[in-house]
Amino acid sequence: MVKIHDGASQLGANVAAPRSPEEATLERVANPHEEALYLARFTAPEFTSLCPVTGQPDFALLVIDYAPDKWIVESKSLKLYLGSFRNRGAFHEDCTVRIGKDLVAVLAPRWLRIGGYWYPRGGMPIDVFWSTGAPPPGLWLPDQGVPPYRGRG
């Protein structure tokens, strides 16, 4: 399980990159607009992990959308947490769903979804989607904007 810290102790500090998600600390800060229903989006266009079988690198575009409640994620801690997967062997589905579940455990958002758009290995892209359920009524929810992978042409 990822470690949780209230506040922004990593922001503005020289912090060593965690070697694994278990060593990473996701930080949360109070939502200054807790009464408002809004969407926050984080996009990680260069997410990497390792294939658990071959040890070869896997690459993905991650799009994380969430409707905050009492907490918002501190972005530097999220960046370091996502980077901690770089040396972790895990299947695409495991990485994508785990990130979503870890964020839910830390933030307890009104709603969250994650799209993992994995680049092809072996000629086949894998897209993984996970959410906490239906979005709240009235939430402006733009498309994640990632077309299906089709290679050249």
From Swiss-Prot:
Functional summary from the UniProt entry: Catalyzes the NADPH-dependent reduction of 7-cyano-7-deazaguanine (preQ0) to 7-aminomethyl-7-deazaguanine (preQ1).
A Pfam entry, by short name: QueF
E.C. no: 1.7.1.13
Keyword Oxidoreductase: yes
Residue numbers spanned by region Disordered: 1-26
A molecular-function term among this protein's GO annotations: preQ1 synthase activity
Recorded metabolic or biological pathway in which this protein acts: tRNA modification; tRNA-queuosine biosynthesis
Native source organism of the sequence: Methylocella silvestris (strain DSM 15510 / CIP 108128 / LMG 27833 / NCIMB 13906 / BL2)
Keywords: Cytoplasm, NADP, Oxidoreductase, Queuosine biosynthesis
Active site: C51 (thioimide intermediate), D58 (proton donor)
List of residues binding substrate: V73, E74, S75, H92, E93
Name assigned to this protein: NADPH-dependent 7-cyano-7-deazaguanine reductase
